[in-house]
Design a protein with these regions (language model features):
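Residue-level signal for alpha-helical context at structural boundaries
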Residues: 49, 138, 183, 205, ...
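Short coil/turn linker and secondary-structure boundary residues
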Residues: 63, 160, 182, 194, ...
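C-terminal engagement/docking regions of AAA+ P-loop ATPases
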Residues: 2-11, 25-30, 218-266
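Residue-level signal for secondary-structure boundary elements
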Residues: 128, 177, 181, 199, ...
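Walker A/P-loop NTP-binding motif of AAA+ ATPase domains
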Residues: 1-185
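AAA+ ATPase "lid" subdomain C-terminal helix
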Residues: 189-226, 230-238
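A general structural signal for short secondary-structure boundary/capping elements
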Residues: 178-179, 200-205, 251
Length: 266
């Protein structure tokens, strides 16, 4: 009905979505969560380096989607998702002249690269296909790709708020009981200005250290305050107020433990 009312042959092209965050991992997580919510067959593209340092475009898909994406060389046959990971790490040749140079550029590309560019272009032009990309910022992306993804909507993802950090630490504590003895209020305050990914990584490193220490001593050792604060400090900028406080608390806890040891020896 909308097509006839508006006098269009088909639904307009859906904007490509670019998830941007100073922490590239956070942008990727939000993008992949969106992929999960959509529940459509998805193909992922990302740039990696070979052992020789040569950039290489890697294309992958879930095994369950293989049959639906078998004819992908000819474009999406139905609804789907094209995921472009860390687009700011992709490089493209500089093209000064627009129309006459594009043909020369495409001819010079390898067959695989041409197919990848054509697939992206077909996905952008297909209203049944969602194109999702992640990057640290829009400005960090090569203009070749921003033009290729037009129309493009940028979704800015900032660092987590205090409320979000509280939810993150609650989520970590639910999965890892050994961390529950550390004050959540302190963790929320001292993890300010950290990306979500760094918070999870700091917690995981502290949990793994406590686990290994328990294996050595042959007993259960929960995650200590000193252990977790030390891991958080490793992710905080050296000139931040949070780093200074974490450093002070770690030294204070260490000094207190030495005092307890002296009392036992004495």
């Amino acid at each position: 009905m909308l097509n006839s009312r508006h006098g269009l042959d088909a639904m307009p092209v859906v904007d490509s979505l670019l998830f941007c965050s100073p922490a590239r991992e956070d942008a990727s997580r939000f993008m992949l969560a969106t992929v999960g919510e959509l529940g459509l067959p998805a193909i992922r593209m990302r740039m990696e380096e070979t052992f020789q340092g040569v950039p290489m475009l890697c294309v992958s898909a879930q095994a369950t989607d293989a049959e639906k994406l078998a004819s992908l060389r000819h474009g999406f046959a139905g609804p789907g998702i094209l995921v472009l990971e860390d687009l700011d790490l992709w490089g493209a040749p500089v093209i000064d002249a627009a129309d006459d140079m594009v043909g020369f550029f495409m001819a010079a590309m390898s067959r695989g690269a041409r197919e990848a560019v054509n697939l992206i272009r077909q996905a952008v032009e297909n209203p049944d296909v969602y194109v999702l990309a992640s990057a640290s910022s829009l400005e960090a992306i090569d203009p070749f790709f921003t033009e290729l993804l037009f129309p493009l909507t940028c979704v800015d993802i900032d660092y987590p708020t205090a409320e979000e950090r509280a939810d993150i630490w609650m989520d970590i504590a639910r999965d890892h009981p050994s961390i529950r003895s550390v004050s959540r209020d302190e963790l929320v305050r001292l993890s300010a200005n950290l990306p979500r990914y760094d918070i999870y990584m700091a917690a995981r490193e502290a949990i793994e250290e406590a686990y290994k220490q328990g294996l050595v001593e042959r007993r259960y050792i929960p995650v200590s305050r000193e252990n977790l604060f030390d891991k958080l400090a490793a992710y905080q900028p050296l000139d931040s107020a949070e780093y200074a406080e974490l450093e002070r608390l770690v030294v204070s806890d260490f000094s207190a433990s030495l005092g307890d040891l002296n009392d036992l020896v004495g």
